[in-house]
Amino acid sequence: MQKGNVWVVDDDSSIRWVLERAITREGMLCRAFEHANDVLKALNSEQPDVLLSDIRMPDMDGLSLLKIIKEQYPTLPVIIMTAHSDLDAAVNAYQQGAFDYLPKPFDIDETLALIERAITHYREQKQPNNAENILQSVSDMIGEAPAMQEVYRIIGRLSRSSISVLINGESGTGKELVAHALHRHSPRALAPFIALNMAAIPKDLIESELFGHEKGAFTGASQVRQGRFEQANGGSLFLDEIGDMPLDIQTRLLRVLAEGQFYRVGGYAPVKVDVRIIAATHQDLEKRVNEGDFREDLYHRLNVIRIQLPPLRDRTEDIPSLARYFLQKTAKELGVETKSLHEQSLKTMMEYVWSGNVRQLENVCRWLTVMTASQEIMPQDLPSEIRLADEKAKNINRLTSQHWSQHLSLWADEALGEGKENILNDALPQFERTLLLSALAYTQGHKQDAARLLGWGRNTLTRKLKELGIEDY
């Protein structure tokens, strides 16, 4: 039995050649097309097991072709390829019935595995759901890293669902952006999206915030107040930092999820709601469950679908596009011309470890827009903590092969061999400078903390900064 019949349509001849060669090597038939209209003509006499289509082509684009195919050949799996990989492209493809979404440049082995899955799917005659067009919007989510592409895929696959989702990720990775995207690209898109941060509300107010209260329920309750559940009725409720929710509120939340109704604080009449829960946390909820700080049954109720957001250090290839976007966004907000990053500045930013992730990068871009005098952002314009980290990294790279004392010994031997004197006076300032820069980088520029780590007083550190020519402090 033939392994499969694969069609490829792409106006890029090199893409057609690479795919055709790889597919035929796997023992599958492959037919390549330059134009979408040629595919439609060929479908009148023959039907493949799977079609790979580029999204941007002359005459007819991939999404238009996909729409026609889903109307006339609903069981034919279509894989959408695009070099313009973003959330909207992925969601549009899934919503219109694509089998999967393949960002360029793609890995050939992964592509072949995807083709085989599509062929299996086709031969099992699994009828896909008809796609529904929903509200389209521009997203602030940016990223071409593989980890972000997987996030796009999940959002796309959930675009016809109202299932609960748990978003995991470090602080600043964009959990609320993902929650907004899940809502915008769902059947609830036109209904309210309500967000509540558990960590930002005093514990004694959380119950009233979530469920509302009746008049006279407690001192100061002068009128009936709707809680976030009622405000989100028909839409989505985003519970940020769910790991900080008190146990008694967890019990009430579990009951609402199970029964679809609740009682306001001080109330006796049940309030029915239809709400999709999207929860997020930077914590390890499984660990919280094991420690008795989070209900296991609630964890399983929320953890139906989990989205893991990558930290910025795992998607450094996205830093240039993110930085450009944030610089443009800030310039537009302030009504000024957009600044550009010098090549070395961008290199330094890509090598920096962004502990605050995307949020920290955005704040730095805001700072640069305001504080940089010239139109081009030079390395010396970067915040001191980034410049110090860069200098520290360079120093570490010089010492990777041997212990620092060995390098010092080699330097001393060379200096003495050259007849130099007073070498201690030459070495000590450099030694102090290295330790001082490391301490300042570690404390993010806090002089008092750096002085304590070095065993100095604050005045000594200030004097050393001046002696060693370390500025900006």
From Swiss-Prot:
The modification 4-aspartylphosphate is found at D54. GO terms for cellular component: cytoplasm. Residues 447-466 bind DNA. Residues 141-370 form the Sigma-54 factor interaction domain. GO terms for molecular function: ATP binding; ATP hydrolysis activity; phosphorelay response regulator activity; sequence-specific DNA binding. Its main location: cytoplasm. Keywords: Activator, ATP-binding, Cytoplasm, DNA-binding, Nitrogen fixation, Nucleotide-binding, Phosphoprotein, Repressor, Transcription, Transcription regulation, Two-component regulatory system. Gene3D superfamilies: 1.10.8.60, 3.40.50.2300, Homeodomain-like, P-loop containing nucleotide triphosphate hydrolases. Residues 5-119 form the Response regulatory domain. It is found in: Cytoplasm. InterPro entries: AAA+_ATPase, CheY-like_superfamily, Homeodomain-like_sf, HTH_Fis, P-loop_NTPase, Sig_transdc_resp-reg_receiver, Sigma_54_int, Sigma_54_int_dom_ATP-bd_1. ATP binds at residues 169-176, 232-241. GO terms for biological process: nitrogen fixation; regulation of DNA-templated transcription; regulation of nitrogen utilization. Coiled coil: none annotated. It comes from the Bacteria. PANTHER family: DNA-BINDING TRANSCRIPTIONAL REGULATOR NTRC, TRANSCRIPTIONAL REGULATORY PROTEIN. This is DNA-binding transcriptional regulator NtrC. It comes from Proteus hauseri.
